[in-house]
């Protein structure tokens, strides 16, 4: 009969024993550099120009697109559960709204500016972030103003984007988050806010490291923002471009960004760590994008993972990599999970 062998080995070194440091649930909490809290979460809201809309997004489980008349009833229970911040994305659906320069982006009667004012009135403690981009509002679906040959006109684009950011701040947004990835827009936004007397009370949260990739499909379904021709590879970062990302992080920090977003997040934890080092004095925000969210739901539906466990694992990974904030479609679930 075979018997188990045990090697005769030297006694274990003192420095090799780690398990005594995490054998108890409280110890495991103490060993966590950052623990997920409600005040770290930012919830994306899609606001359309159809006032009574409440349309589920098929590719984004549990997420809807809302008109202004449906917004308060949806947000109120989330605020009561501890929601502290939202990021607004406007979705113009009415015929004839879009044009080559995204005029509707900062229309005072448009969905975003209406939503800013409504949410500030109904929920004074809720922190309002506005995504700043033109893609939802341009007839061509690109993030800036184009030359006749279809390439980005940098100067006109950043001038337009800065104007939109300033108008959101004038309407009451606490924070503007430019997501266009067009060179130099942080500097122009900051200058615009200074000129408007708003820089002292408007946080500029830059999508400094936003990569071109395959994980934005459900968002584009929700925001109706797919390009009508071409793609965004000439202004969003290439997936393997770590050096470019590091340069973009340093640039936006130097241009006056108050915080940094890394997007997507799961496949870019190295960039998040880079951001926490290059921009060490700024809050780093992970954007858990629509495709990442949808993938976790799909895996859970197949029985491959437990949804709650994998959501926590992914988000705790962002914190471990250096994030302090997370834009997450899981925010409503986390508000319940973190309460229980």
From Swiss-Prot:
InterPro entries: ALAD (IPR001731), ALAD_AS (IPR030656), Aldolase_TIM (IPR013785). One of its GO terms (molecular function) is porphobilinogen synthase activity. GO terms for cellular component: cytosol. It catalyses: 2 5-aminolevulinate = porphobilinogen + 2 H2O + H(+). Its EC number is 4.2.1.24. Zn(2+) binds at residues 133, 135, 143. The active site is at residues 210, 263. The keyword Nucleotide-binding does not apply. Pfam families: ALAD (PF00490). Binds 1 zinc ion per monomer. 5-aminolevulinate 2 binds at residues 290, 329. Its cofactor is Zn(2+). Pathway: Porphyrin-containing compound metabolism; protoporphyrin-IX biosynthesis; coproporphyrinogen-III from 5-aminolevulinate: step 1/4. GO terms for biological process: heme biosynthetic process; protoporphyrinogen IX biosynthetic process. 5-aminolevulinate 1 binds at residues 220, 232. Keywords: Heme biosynthesis, Lyase, Metal-binding, Porphyrin biosynthesis, Zinc. Catalyzes an early step in the biosynthesis of tetrapyrroles. Binds two molecules of 5-aminolevulinate per subunit, each at a distinct site, and catalyzes their condensation to form porphobilinogen. Belongs to the ALAD family. Homooctamer. This is Delta-aminolevulinic acid dehydratase. It comes from Candida glabrata (strain ATCC 2001 / BCRC 20586 / JCM 3761 / NBRC 0622 / NRRL Y-65 / CBS 138). The gene is HEM2.
């Amino acid at each position: 009969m075979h018997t188990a062998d045990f090697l005769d080995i030297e006694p274990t070194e003192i420095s090799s024993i780690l398990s005594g440091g995490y054998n108890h649930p409280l110890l495991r909490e103490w060993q966590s550099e950052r623990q997920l809290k409600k005040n770290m979460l930012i919830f994306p809201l899609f606001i359309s120009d159809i006032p009574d809309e409440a349309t589920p997004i098929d590719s984004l489980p549990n997420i809807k697109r809302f008109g202004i008349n449906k917004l308060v009833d949806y947000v109120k229970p989330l605020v009561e559960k501890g929601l502290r911040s939202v990021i607004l994305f406007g979705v113009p659906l009415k015929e004839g709204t879009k044009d080559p320069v995204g005029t509707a982006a900062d229309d005072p009667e448009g969905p975003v500016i209406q939503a800013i004012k409504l949410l500030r009135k109904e929920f004074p403690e809720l922190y309002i972030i506005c995504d700043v981009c033109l893609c939802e509002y341009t007839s061509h679906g690109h993030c800036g103003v184009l030359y006749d040959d279809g390439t980005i006109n940098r100067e006109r684009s950043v001038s337009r984007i800065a104007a939109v950011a300033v108008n959101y701040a004038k309407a009451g947004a606490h924070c503007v988050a430019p997501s266009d990835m067009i060179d130099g827009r942080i500097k122009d936004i900051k200058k615009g806010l200074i000129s408007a007397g708003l820089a002292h009370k408007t946080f500029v949260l830059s999508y400094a490291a936003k990569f071109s990739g395959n994980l934005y499909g459900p968002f584009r379904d929700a925001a109706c923002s797919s390009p009508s021709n071409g793609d965004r590879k000439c202004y969003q970062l290439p997936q393997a471009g770590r050096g470019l990302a590091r340069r973009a992080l340093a640039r936006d920090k130097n241009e006056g960004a108050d915080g940094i977003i890394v997007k997507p997040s799961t496949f870019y934890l190295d960039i998040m760590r880079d951001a926490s080092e290059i921009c060490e004095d700024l809050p780093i925000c992970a954007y858990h994008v629509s495709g990442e969210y949808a993938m976790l739901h799909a895996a859970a539906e197949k029985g491959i993972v437990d949804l709650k466990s994998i959501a926590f694992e992914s988000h705790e990974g962002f914190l471990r990599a250096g994030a302090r904030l997370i834009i997450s479609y899981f925010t409503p679930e986390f508000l319940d999970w973190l309460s229980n």
